[in-house]
From Swiss-Prot:
Domain-level remarks: Despite low primary sequence conservation between eukaryotic catalytic subunits and bacterial and archaeal single subunit OSTs (ssOST), structural comparison revealed several common motifs at spatially equivalent positions, like the DXD motif 1 on the external loop 1 and the DXD motif 2 on the external loop 2 involved in binding of the metal ion cofactor and the carboxamide group of the acceptor asparagine, the conserved Glu residue of the TIXE/SVSE motif on the external loop 5 involved in catalysis, as well as the WWDYG and the DK/MI motifs in the globular domain that define the binding pocket for the +2 Ser/Thr of the acceptor sequon.
Motif, WWDYG motif: chain positions: 465-469
Pfam families from the UniProt entry: AglB_core-like (PF22627), STT3 (PF02516)
Result when mutating residue 521 to Q: Reduces catalytic activity
TM stretches of this protein: 6-26, 68-88, 92-112, 122-142, 148-168, 170-190, 220-240, 253-273, 276-296, 304-324, 328-344, 348-368, 409-429
Protein name: Dolichyl-phosphooligosaccharide-protein glycotransferase 1
Organism this protein belongs to: Archaeoglobus fulgidus (strain ATCC 49558 / DSM 4304 / JCM 9628 / NBRC 100126 / VC-16)
EC nos: 2.4.99.21
Site feature (Important for catalytic activity) residues: 139
Intervals of motif DXD motif 2: 146-148
Renumbered ranges of motif DXD motif 1: 34-36
Length: 591
């Protein structure tokens, strides 16, 4: 069968699984997947309609506001169609861009696999496994207008170019530069590629890789910590190329060099050097040394079962087994390092799935060979045939044996193994009908604010838990106390866990709160699906030492309970103004 047809089938599969929730997204408007997407669109709306990208926003962390520090590339990409054709075009483009990037990433996996093994069947299997991996789907699903899809695409493009010969290695620095302009954490993925390159390449190739890292170091002009990090990685690789020259005399020279480099980083971490505080910040980020990170689902550590499920279930197990047979040190190094990252924070499974797909595809290929479905053997024979410039009759006869039914059986085998992946990859839309109605009501019924001017402090704010902050900001066009950036989260947590109305109203006055929004999932209404323990943790309570019964008893004495469960009937300064199923809106009165 024509490999182009099979690749097209993989692409169509990747599109299909990523087009979930189409009806929810285009439901009487345009909605997005997740939470962070909404703040990106808030920035894009200001950029398109007001012709500037704000570096400060009074509509979050009200009334203090918050500085916008992350790189702007992704926002400018989303805003570009709007600058030409109006904001509505950016709204639509933002819905489909992650899917486009996801499909391109699938193609890059295929090309990378070809670069590593030079076998089309192996490459197609790699692409299919990556296309089905739950975490790869979640990051590139329809409406997921967040920077992750772009970062992963650029990471894959960098890896692919590094694996090519000659000057292509230097060009790998270009996608790394774009990655640096899209995510402040880009040096983490740059380091992952650098360590993998050091282990895999010889000294000559390593010098080209080192040169490529000077390109993203240019980002120093806009983001000095990022630029310095990439320059440090370039130096690390250049010195590594020198060390490689001594491997004939000192067998483990590279290993000692890596150990020495890690020790140097640790020294920088523990010694208070003002100019290198970003190193400490980066390490703390990786290890999740932050009060907020343990309360974020994707930032949890040591989630081994979730790592397995997010990376492909049985396919991830295949990857672990394949480590015993696979010989490409670039892929093996990337797998082990990204696995360590994923153990530190679950979010890094987005990069772990890359080597995992390649490794599992290799084991699947070996199994197919044992079942007399030619994969590597067929490629070898075809190569010999091309060299002889004539078709060997035996090869031709063997190729003819691989008919449609054989391909169909193999495809069915791969799909059956991928069923758990597909089931997990399809997730309910975050924004329920109750929330859509509540957000639209707030947009049209509450006092209007000058939403498009983030530099002007509005008259009031809306208190909610941080998960809903960006929804309220973008859809309802109202200022919020806290959103997914965690600023304001402590006050929000203390407000909801307050044991007296007086305590809650003091926080409300401090934060200029006029309305409060609650939902079932932040209460203890369903103990198996609740955000309340996370709220308690942010408020300063040690939830780990409490039983479920103690947490429930604590909840029953909070202002959140008296608001959401009792509809504020026994409160003086709050009254229920509107209810939309699971979502309730209260007004602060007499404050």
């Amino acid at each position: 069968m024509d490999r182009k047809v099979l690749m097209l089938a993989v692409i169509l599969f990747a599109l299909a699984v990523r087009f979930q929730n189409f009806g929810e997204i285009f439901d009487s408007g345009i909605y997005y997947t997740g939470y962070d997407s909404y703040y990106h669109m808030r920035l894009v709306e200001v950029m398109v309609k007001e012709s500037f990208r704000p570096d400060y926003d009074y509509y979050i962390n009200y009334p203090f506001g918050l500085k916008i520090t992350w790189p702007p590339l992704f926002d400018y990409i989303l805003a570009f169609p709007g600058m030409l054709f109006g904001f509505h075009s950016s709204e639509i483009f933002a819905v489909f861009l992650p899917v486009i990037l996801g499909v391109l990433s699938v193609v890059l996996i295929c090309l990378t696999a070809l670069q590593i093994v030079n076998n089309q069947t192996f490459a197609l299997i790699s692409a299919f496994i990556y296309a089905a991996a739950p975490v790869a789907v979640w990051k590139t699903v329809l409406g997921q207008a967040d920077h992750h899809a772009l970062v992963i695409f650029l990471f894959l493009l960098s890896a692919y170019l590094l694996l090519k010969d000659g000057v292509w290695k230097i060009l790998a620095g270009l996608p790394m530069l774009f990655m640096a302009l899209a995510w402040l954490g880009s040096p983490i993925y740059g380091a992952l590629l650098a360590f993998s390159a050091l282990v895999h390449f010889d000294r000559k190739a390593l010098r080209l890789v080192a040169a490529s890292y000077l390109i993203p170091a240019i980002s120093f002009v806009l983001y000095p910590p990022v630029g310095i990090s990439f320059f440090g990685l370039a130096a690390f690789l250049f010195v590594g190329s020198v060390v490689k020259g001594y491997e004939d005399r000192f067998r483990n020279a590279t290993i000692y060099y890596i150990a020495l480099s890690l020790a140097t980083v640790l020294i920088i971490y523990f010694i208070p050097l003002p100019h290198f505080e970003f190193v400490k910040g980066g390490i703390n980020y990786i290890f999740g040394a932050n009060i907020y990170l343990p309360t974020i689902s994707e930032a949890r550590s040591l989630q081994i079962f979730e790592i397995i499920s997010a990376s492909g279930y049985i396919y991830f197990i295949f990857a672990l087994i394949s480590v015993l047979f696979f010989r490409n040190r670039f892929v093996l190094s990337m797998f082990f390092l990204s696995f360590i990252l994923a153990l530190m924070q679950l979010r890094f499974t987005e990069v772990l799935v890359v080597p995992s797909a390649l490794l599992s595809a290799y084991l699947v290929s070996l199994v197919l060979e044992r079942l007399e479905y030619p994969v590597f053997e067929k490629a070898d024979e075809e190569e010999k045939s091309r060299r002889r410039k004539r078709k060997d009759r035996k090869v031709k006869q063997k190729n003819a044996e691989v008919e449609w039914k054989d391909h169909a059986v193999v495809a069915a085998f791969l799909v059956i193994l991928a069923i758990p992946c597909i089931v997990v990859a399809v997730v309910p839309f975050d924004l329920t009908e109750d929330w859509k109605e509540a957000l639209e009501w707030m947009r049209t019924s509450l006092e209007e604010q000058n939403y498009l001017n983030p530099y002007e402090k509005p008259e009031y704010s809306v208190m909610s838990w941080w998960d809903y902050g960006n929804w309220i900001l973008y859809v309802s066009k109202k200022a919020v106390v806290c959103n997914n950036f965690q600023a304001g989260a402590v006050d929000a947590a203390k407000f909801f866990t307050a044991k007296s109305e007086d305590e809650a109203i003091k926080i409300a006055k401090k934060r200029g709160v006029r309305y409060v929004v609650t939902a079932d999932e932040i209460t203890m209404k369903d103990a198996n699906n609740t955000k309340f323990p996370a709220i308690m943790r942010i408020a300063g309570y040690n939830v780990d030492l409490m039983t479920e019964g103690e947490i429930l008893n604590f909840f029953n004495h909070t202002v959140l309970y008296r608001l959401h469960m009792e509809n504020a009937e026994n409160l003086t300064h709050f009254r229920l103004v509107k209810e939309f199923g699971d979502v309730k809106i209260f007004e602060v009165v007499g404050s």
